[in-house]
């Protein structure tokens, strides 16, 4: 592991431990590689944006909300905001008005950087009692072209002499982002003090919001540097990354901003995941490393396109963001080169990446890997609050402590206990140095049933002790079985209460794959019944839908799915029909 260094984040990122060619492009648009920055151009662009942000009135501690799709300028915006002393926050460009209203109240940004298509949503927020009084900076395709051209010219001839030709016009209450480039250059906020690094916010990353509105987890300069150092290790292949995950999300941030400028490792950027453009980008740019969420893995595994041929250059695929079963990873692994690894990993916005399967480390399918440097763990019985062994026979809720933990939540104090432990909400156990995620404690389905036929798995003999004589069923385990069926494109499982209130039971929401013959509810019920213990049966039924609601990072949005389920049952009651269908 590299030495931490007691420094600010931007200085850390721009201080390469090994020399690399500063003229090699390192941030590139995957669909238009002429939109690219080398290290010299990128450094100048960051310093120019810092000068522009300060000229616009950004002060230390001010928040800037970036509401854009993935673009080649994203990392420059990130470092410029942090370098000007500000606090970065990103969100989905397609955020609906009620979510954006919540974020404006939560983050209190002084600036919003957004796309033309999102302006109408920002206007709607003002009608919902959240009028944004700060400055709006507009970014469109012309802006990106102008910024790239500026960086190319300025790196060759000097920033102050190369501002001519930039568009400098207002668009209603907005100004174009490239107008910030007319103020010369300014150095970033620097410090070499451990305590200042640990207490100075650099970014706020939104939590997944699967059970409600997202929270803003505050990451300091020290936190983000710690995240990077925990996941970085040397590999025996040339690293060329592709990013199709949201770059504003913490999982995307881990691999997006620092690696290119610190190590000279090229990053190709796609605006979003689309299977055809993704496969084209991997093939055309000889991508060796990328990161996915399980939904992307399922799409690629089920595709009729020449996936294996297109992915031949890959050497490592990191998978996280939501639960994924061992079968799905093994199926995907067969599409990759024999020299490649598809490795699961586990982390949270609040704590960073804690467990990781690394390249050429023997894989245990279904495991999220081994513990990364710097983290401490506890396993706690959620019913008693007492520590447990964290073995397959005695799993526990995971508590984490270490330098990668959040500073806190914005406007909340329920982040860590007095000893610095963060309660993750995930049930976990360890076996032979590898860690296994059972599921979210709040998502586990509490089933009262018969004694199971087999005592071979953790769920068969431990969770009745943990959950008041009821068995805890992990939705992800059932989802993994359902996804083995070639007729299933996507699936999510929730718990529903029996009419007499005696027990929760699993109910599956399934998206068909569109092949013939179609899988039936009875077939899927039988599939689960034959492969899992009897108390994990789909006694709540199977419901076929067109789409599973998911978060921006690909997690099943179980709270929204449960709400839709309640509305469905209410409608069925009014119509006098039975459910599930």
Curated annotation (Swiss-Prot):
The keyword Nucleotide-binding applies. SUPFAM superfamilies: Acetyl-CoA synthetase-like. The keyword Ligase applies. PROSITE patterns: AMP_BINDING (PS00455). AMP binds at residues 204-215. Its EC number is 6.2.1.-. GO terms for molecular function: ATP binding; CoA-ligase activity. Pathway: Secondary metabolite biosynthesis; terpenoid biosynthesis. Pyripyropene A and its derivatives have very unique characteristics of selectively inhibiting the acyl-coenzyme A:cholesterol acyltransferase 2 (ACAT2) isozyme. Therefore, pyripyropenes are expected to be developed as a new type of anti-atherosclerotic agent. Furthermore, pyripyropenes have been shown to exhibit anti-angiogenic activity against human umbilical vein endothelial cells. Finally, pyripyropene A also exhibits insecticidal properties. Keywords: ATP-binding, Ligase, Nucleotide-binding. Residues 477-555 are annotated as: AMP-binding. Pfam families: AMP-binding, AMP-binding_C. InterPro entries: AMP-bd_C, AMP-bd_C_sf, AMP-binding_CS, AMP-dep_synth/lig_dom, ANL_N_sf. CDD domains: Firefly_Luc_like (cd05911). Signal peptide: none annotated. It catalyses: nicotinate + ATP + CoA = nicotinyl-CoA + AMP + diphosphate. GO terms for biological process: terpenoid biosynthetic process. Belongs to the ATP-dependent AMP-binding enzyme family. PANTHER family: ADENYLATE-FORMING ENZYME AFEA, LONG-CHAIN-FATTY-ACID--COA LIGASE. Nicotinic acid-CoA ligase; part of the gene cluster that mediates the biosynthesis of pyripyropene A, a specific human acyl-coenzyme A:cholesterol acyltransferase 2 inhibitor. The first step of the pathway is the synthesis of nicotinyl-CoA from nicotinic acid by the nicotinic acid-CoA ligase pyr1. Nicotinyl-CoA is then a substrate of polyketide synthase pyr2 to produce 4-hydroxy-6-(3-pyridinyl)-2H-pyran-2-one (HPPO) which is further prenylated by the polyprenyl transferase pyr6 to yield farnesyl-HPPO. This is Nicotinic acid-CoA ligase pyr1. It comes from Aspergillus fumigatus (strain ATCC MYA-4609 / CBS 101355 / FGSC A1100 / Af293) (Neosartorya fumigata).
């Amino acid at each position: 592991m590299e030495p931490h260094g007691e420094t600010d984040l931007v200085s850390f990122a721009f201080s390469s431990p090994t020399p690399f060619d500063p003229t090699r492009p390192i941030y590139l648009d995957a669909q238009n590689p002429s939109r690219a920055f080398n290290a010299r151009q990128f450094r100048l662009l960051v310093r120019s944006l810092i000068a522009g942000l300060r000229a616009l009135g950004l002060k230390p501690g001010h928040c800037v909300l970036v509401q854009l799709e993935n673009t080649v300028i994203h990392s420059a915006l990130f470092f410029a905001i942090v370098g000007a002393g500000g606090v970065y926050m990103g969100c989905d460009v397609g955020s609906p008005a009620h979510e954006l209203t919540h974020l404006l109240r939560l983050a209190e940004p002084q600036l919003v950087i957004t796309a033309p298509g999102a302006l109408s949503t920002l206007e709607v927020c003002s009608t919902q009692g959240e009028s944004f009084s700060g400055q709006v900076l507009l970014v469109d395709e012309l802006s990106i072209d102008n910024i790239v051209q500026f960086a190319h010219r300025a790196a060759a001839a000097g920033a102050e002499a190369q501002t001519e030709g930039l568009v400098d016009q207002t668009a209603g209450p907005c100004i174009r982002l490239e107008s910030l480039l007319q103020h010369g250059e300014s150095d970033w906020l620097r410090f070499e003090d451990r305590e200042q690094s640990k207490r100075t916010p650099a970014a706020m990353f939104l939590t997944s919001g699967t059970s409600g509105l997202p929270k803003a987890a505050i990451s300091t300069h020290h936190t983000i540097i710690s995240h990077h150092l925990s996941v970085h290790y040397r590999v025996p292949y040339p690293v060329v990354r592709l990013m199709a995950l949201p770059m504003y999300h913490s999982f995307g941030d881990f691999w997006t901003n620092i690696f290119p400028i610190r190590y000279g490792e090229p990053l190709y950027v796609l605006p979003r995941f689309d299977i055809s453009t993704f496969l084209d980008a991997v093939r055309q740019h000889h991508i060796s490393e990328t990161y996915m969420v399980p939904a992307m893995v399922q799409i690629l595994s089920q595709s009729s396109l020449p996936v294996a041929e297109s992915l031949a250059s890959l050497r490592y695929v990191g998978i996280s963001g939501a639960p994924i079963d061992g079968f799905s990873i093994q199926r995907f692994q067969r599409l990759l080169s024999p020299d490649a690894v598809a490795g699961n990993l586990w982390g949270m916005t609040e704590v960073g990446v804690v467990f990781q399967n690394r390249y050429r480390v023997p894989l245990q399918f279904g495991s999220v890997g081994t513990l990364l440097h710097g983290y401490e763990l506890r396993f706690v019985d959620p019913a008693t609050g007492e520590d447990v062994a964290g073995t397959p026979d005695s799993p526990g809720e995971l508590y984490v402590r270490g330098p990668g933990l959040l500073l806190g939540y914005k406007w909340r104090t329920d982040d860590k206990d007095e000893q610095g432990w963060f309660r993750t909400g995930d049930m976990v156990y360890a076996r032979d140095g590898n860690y296994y995620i059972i599921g979210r404690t709040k998502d586990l389905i509490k089933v009262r049933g018969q004694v199971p036929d087999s005592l071979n798995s953790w769920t068969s003999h431990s969770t009745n002790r943990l959950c008041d004589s009821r068995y805890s069923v992990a939705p992800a385990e059932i989802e993994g079985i359902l996804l083995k069926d070639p007729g299933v494109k996507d699936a999510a499982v929730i718990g529903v209460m029996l009419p007499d209130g005696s027990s929760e039971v699993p109910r599956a929401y399934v998206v068909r794959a569109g092949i013939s013959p179609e899988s039936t509810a009875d077939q899927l019920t039988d599939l689960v019944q034959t492969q899992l213990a009897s108390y994990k049966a789909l006694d709540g039924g199977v419901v076929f839908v067109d789409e599973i609601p998911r978060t921006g990072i690909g997690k099943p949005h179980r709270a929204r799915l449960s709400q839709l389920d309640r509305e469905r049952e209410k409608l069925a009651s009014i119509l006098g029909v039975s459910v599930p269908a």
